[in-house]
Design a protein with these regions (language model features):
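An N-terminal boundary/leader segment
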Residues: 1-47, 51-54
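Hydrophobic side-chain positions on well-ordered alpha-helices
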Residues: 13-17, 62, 168
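Conserved hydrophobic/aromatic pocket- or pore-lining residues that grip, position, or stack substrates
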Residues: 31, 52, 80, 112, ...
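Enzymes and membrane/adaptor proteins characterized by extended Gly/Ser/Thr/Asp/Glu-rich
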Residues: 38-39, 71-108, 132
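Long amphipathic alpha-helix in the N-terminal Rossmann-like dinucleotide-binding domain
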Residues: 50-57, 116-117, 126
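Immediate post-signal peptide segment of exported/extracytoplasmic ligand-binding proteins
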Residues: 59-76
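Short glycine/serine-rich loop segments
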Residues: 104-182
């Protein structure tokens, strides 16, 4: 098992948290730090570090009280900005929805939060997920974390409508993503 919390798999996070190897807050803080450090790659349209910490604190509190833990307690995720999340800007990467804050949860997000997951933020994508290069987002292209022979990576696209998901996973910015992949 890695000493870096952001290198752990979902199962390793879950099991390590349950075994007391680390707290859920430590996991959320590590992922929040990676999200902040990788801001230049533009994978997240909206960052929600407080949501990740809130879910982590709830998991730590439940564990301390001896309560049954939820399946995804302590696991931080990036949510594709295609899914509505109550009170959090949801744009589908479109200018038309730039100010939209849903008053409800999508079925996908509700199930994840009910399972104990914490949201690190909303992941960038092609506008309305209608693309294959992740270059049509109103909020700008996602920059690939890979470098071409040690050179500039700005011209590289992570590809797929879920480019933010692909980029953030490679850079240790979230352990799971919710969005289609090709």
């Amino acid at each position: 098992m890695s000493n870096n919390l952001t290198d752990l798999t979902v199962a390793e996070i879950r099991d390590g948290f349950r075994a007391g190897d680390f707290s859920a807050r430590e996991v959320a803080e590590a992922f929040n730090a990676n999200v902040a450090a990788a801001k230049a790659l533009n994978a997240f349209i909206v960052e929600t570090p407080d949501k990740a910490l809130e879910a982590a604190d709830a998991a730590d509190k439940a564990k301390a009280a001896g309560e049954a833990l939820k399946p995804l307690s302590s696991v931080p995720i990036g949510m594709k900005d295609l899914f509505c999340t109550e009170g959090v800007q949801t744009t589908a990467a479109s200018h038309m929805l730039e100010e939209f804050k849903p008053t409800y949860e999508s079925t996908v997000s509700k199930k994840l939060w009910d399972a104990g997951a914490g949201m690190l933020g909303k992941l960038n994508l092609d506008q309305f997920a209608m693309g294959s290069s992740n270059e049509t987002s109103y909020f700008g292209n996602v920059i690939s974390p890979w470098r071409r022979g040690g050179g500039d990576n700005a011209a590289l696209a992570p590809g797929g409508s879920s480019g933010g998901s692909r980029r953030r996973f490679r850079r240790g910015c979230a352990r799971r993503r919710r969005g289609p992949t090709r």
